[in-house]
């Protein structure tokens, strides 16, 4: 039998070919990865993030954002100083240097005081070369006042609006409020602050700082929203709520202002506005809405099962639109709260569906001293939530709440569901 012979040269060539192909594959993979990274970086630099937010407090940027702004050298600073010196002094209605410790102003002739500090509060990104346009329509109130509201003056809000086309930035400056009513009866003053919401999205809710013991607060705070297309501004509205801070209870609502942006032209420069603060309209609905709940008492385990099912016909909390409701459930024993639960928040709806179940342990077999409180609240990010309506079920509860509780006690181990009208919280 002849011996089998193989060529060693063929086996030596195989590793060489594999190595060459591996090297080419590695180079191709690295090149592809580098190209993808470059494409992502260039796309990210060219894309403007929508609704980026910057807050400026009296000319100081407390939420800085790097927007690839170039550094200014000595020559640029000098030229900018000369340009600002060449600008004429603008006559304004108040003098910031004449404020007292509470932020109040002396009663003087409005034409006598002048200051340029009030207008020069925008960031350096916005050169003040545009003309300031004051629209005659902006000096009118956003809502016609009734005879009752005219008798009860709630003050005036001063603000300015501006749009920067280069940065696609919408700038709102809350300047001051004058003539606010006193919410503290002892000191005859208020601790005011302002909340602002952009409608109809309600995604951006901002607020100013609290100014202590003043009825004429000067906030001078600038809120800048980046990535807002100019045509989109015509579809928006600004809702301002003027409140007085209360350390021990819910903040007092002084009033509100609604500024629709449709028809307002910001292409000519900054626009100054004054709006009368009107009373918050709480009579937008005939009632506070209804709540559907189901309860079951288990006598063998001394537990109470509570199911929050639905809510309907919930009123608007204010002119900012629909509420963001959720339900808070409190269990009381002898007028002492022993347990609490809450549902998830349902966004922008007057008819919410919850379908959430909670189980409470009852400390004793008798239900005479047990009561269940349902609070329907409007979720407000960054501030205290407002109570839309309230419902109480218990032995001493009035109306449908007492009847529902009696059925629960008479028929244990049975899930009993009923609709209830909500009352004021």
UniProtKB/Swiss-Prot annotation:
It is found in: Cytoplasmic vesicle, Secretory vesicle, Neuronal dense core vesicle membrane. Induction: Up-regulated by potassium depolarization, calcium ionophore, ATP and forskolin in culture cells. Up-regulated by kainate in the hippocampus and piriform cortex. Residues 153-274, 287-420 form the C2 domain. Residues 137-146 have a biased composition (Low complexity). Residues 105-119 have a biased composition (Polar residues). Keywords: Calcium, Cytoplasmic vesicle, Differentiation, Membrane, Metal-binding, Phosphoprotein, Repeat, Transmembrane, Transmembrane helix. Gene3D superfamilies: C2 domain (2.60.40.150). One of its GO terms (molecular function) is calcium ion binding. InterPro entries: C2_dom, C2_domain_sf, Synaptotagmin. Its main location: membrane. The keyword Calcium applies. The chain crosses the membrane at residues 17-37. The keyword Membrane applies. Its cofactor is Ca(2+). Residues 102-121, 126-147 are annotated as: Disordered. It is a single-pass membrane protein. Phosphorylation at Ser-135 by MAPK8/JNK1 reduces interaction with KIF1A and neuronal dense core vesicles mobility. PANTHER family: SYNAPTOTAGMIN, SYNAPTOTAGMIN-4. Synaptotagmin family member which does not bind Ca(2+). Involved in neuronal dense core vesicles (DCVs) mobility through its interaction with KIF1A. Upon increased neuronal activity, phosphorylation by MAPK8/JNK1 destabilizes the interaction with KIF1A and captures DCVs to synapses. Plays a role in dendrite formation by melanocytes. This is Synaptotagmin-4.
């Amino acid at each position: 039998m002849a011996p089998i012979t193989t060529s060693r040269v063929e086996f030596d060539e195989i590793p060489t070919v594999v190595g060459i192909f591996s090297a080419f594959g590695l180079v191709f993979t690295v090149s592809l990865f580098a190209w993808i990274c470059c494409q992502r970086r260039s796309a990210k630099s060219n894309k403007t993030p929508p609704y980026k937010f910057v807050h400026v407090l009296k000319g100081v940027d407390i939420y800085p954002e790097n927007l690839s702004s170039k550094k200014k050298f000595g020559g640029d600073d000098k030229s900018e100083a000369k340009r600002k010196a060449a600008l004429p002094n603008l006559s304004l209605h108040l003098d910031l240097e004449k404020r007292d410790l509470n932020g109040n102003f002396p009663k003087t002739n409005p034409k006598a005081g002048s200051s340029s500090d009030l207008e020069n509060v925008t960031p350096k990104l916005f050169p003040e070369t545009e003309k300031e346009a004051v629209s005659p329509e902006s000096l009118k109130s956003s809502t016609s006042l009734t005879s009752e509201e005219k008798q009860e003056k709630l003050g005036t809000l001063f603000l300015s609006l501006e749009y920067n086309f280069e940065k696609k930035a919408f700038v709102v400056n809350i300047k001051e409020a004058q003539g606010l009513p006193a919410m503290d009866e002892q000191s005859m003053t208020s601790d005011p602050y302002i909340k602002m919401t952009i409608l109809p999205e309600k995604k951006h809710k901002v607020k100013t700082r609290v100014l202590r013991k003043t009825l004429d607060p000067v906030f001078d705070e600038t809120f800048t929203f980046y990535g807002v297309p100019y045509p989109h501004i015509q579809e928006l509205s600004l809702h301002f709520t003027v409140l007085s801070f209360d350390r021990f209870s819910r903040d007092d609502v002084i009033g509100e202002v609604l500024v629709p942006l449709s028809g307002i032209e910001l292409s000519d420069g900054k626009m100054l506005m004054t709006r009368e603060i009107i009373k918050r309209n709480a009579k937008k609905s005939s009632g506070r809405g209804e709540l559907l709940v189901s309860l079951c008492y288990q006598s063998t385990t001394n537990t109470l099962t509570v199911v929050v099912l639905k809510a309907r016909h919930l009123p608007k909390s204010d002119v900012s639109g629909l509420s963001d409701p959720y339900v808070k459930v409190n269990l009381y024993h002898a007028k002492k709260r022993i347990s609490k639960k809450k549902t998830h928040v349902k966004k922008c709806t007057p008819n919410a569906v919850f379908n959430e179940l909670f189980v409470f342990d009852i400390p004793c077999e008798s239900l005479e001293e047990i009561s269940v409180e349902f609070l329907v609240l409007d979720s407000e990010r960054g501030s205290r939530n407002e109570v839309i309506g309230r419902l109480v079920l218990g032995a001493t509860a009035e109306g449908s709440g007492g009847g529902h509780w009696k059925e629960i006690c008479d028929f244990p181990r049975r899930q009993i569901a009923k609709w209830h009208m909500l009352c004021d919280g």
